[in-house]
Amino acid sequence: MIFKLLKLMSWFTAQCRKQFYNLVFSTQFRYFGKGCTIDISGQVKLGKNIYIGDHVTLIVEQGACLEIADDSFIGESCYIKCFGGKIEIGRDVSINSKSYINGCGGVCIGDNTRIGTQSIIIASNHKFGEPDILVKDSITKQGIILGENIWLGARVTVLDGVKISSNSVIGACSLVSKPLDTSGVYVGVPAKKIRAL
């Protein structure tokens, strides 16, 4: 009996949390997790039926923008930070647990894309090699574009200036440091095409 009561209380708390965020963001969440960190000074546009997992961090600084389209999934402990750029997450996108997205230079993720657990997407970089300029003062922001229907395996890293063509697969633990202009299966460090799709 006590376990049933505890389960009911947990369900009730989750429903209250979801309804609160539905009101705050004027949308209908599928689920809004516990222990989330929400720090918003910029613009946010959210679609319907979005799943936000437990312990997700969403930071949208002033002058930045976050857009998440309908039916998308943000897994537990993901960290999404928009500072100075725009992050656009398309329809029915899945970003699995513990992934990190830095949107400094802008990130666009196309519809129906799957991002594996612990993946890293960083839309900025540091220049080096000029003795008169400190590394911390020399930042590039080219942005990242992921096309539609892409699958990034677990622990994939995507660096600034990359565009990945639609209908591509990036193998687990790969590093994408240059644009991938044609669809295919890519693996390795750096990622190289091993098969056309």
Task: Identify the residue ranges that each predicted region occupies.
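A generic "structured core" feature
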Residues: 151, 169-175
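Extended, small-residue-rich solenoid/repeat segments and analogous flexible loops
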Residues: 1-51, 57
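Flexible, glycine/small-residue-enriched loop-and-beta-strand segment within the central core
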Residues: 41-44, 51-160, 189, 197
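Short beta-to-alpha loop/turn elements within the nucleotide-binding domains of ABC transporters
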Residues: 162, 173-174, 180, 189
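Short alpha-helix at the nucleotide-sugar/activated-sugar donor binding site of glycosyltransferases
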Residues: 114, 168-169
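Conserved beta-strand-loop-alpha-helix hinge in the C-terminal portion
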Residues: 182-196
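Conserved catalytic segment of ABC-fold P-loop ATPases
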Residues: 165-168, 181-183
